[in-house]
Amino acid sequence: MGPEEKTIMTERSAAVFIQAWWRGMLVRRTLLHAALRAWIIQCWWRQVLEKLLAKRRRMVLEFYVQQEWAAVRLQSWVRMWCVRQRYCRLLNAVRIIQVYWRWHSCHSRVFIEGHYELKENQLNIQLEISLGLQACKVQQCIPLPLKE
């Protein structure tokens, strides 16, 4: 092998080396572009998944709030019903006590006071009747038929 052949071989190996380097650069550039595009797609997909997850969380939270509000409303209605029942029972008891008290006070506190005068042919009556807090005054002149 002569010096010319050596230079041809070195030129050829240099050309092969440059071609390999260039092909490697092209492949690396293509891989870099593919990796960047894949990274962009992955970022977009993560955002989509995060939005879906946030939407699901929001729906679950709204459902929970709705359930809680319904439970609170139902509890308040039940409490109101219990209080109303108790109030009605107490009101009926008060009415019964009032009826008996009024009956008792009317029947136990009757006070009758009266005067009468008999003059010639008429009878003068003055009566005062007290029923508890109420008073009634009666004054009447009654003519008497006398047989002569």
UniProtKB/Swiss-Prot annotation:
Q: Does the keyword Ubl conjugation apply?
A: no
Q: Which residues form the IQ domain?
A: 11-40, 67-96
For molecular function, the Gene Ontology terms on record are: calmodulin binding
Keyword line = Repeat
Which InterPro entries does the record cross-reference, listed alphabetically?
A: IQ_motif_EF-hand-BS, IQCF
What protein name does the entry list?
IQ domain-containing protein F5
Say which species the protein is native to: Homo sapiens (Human)
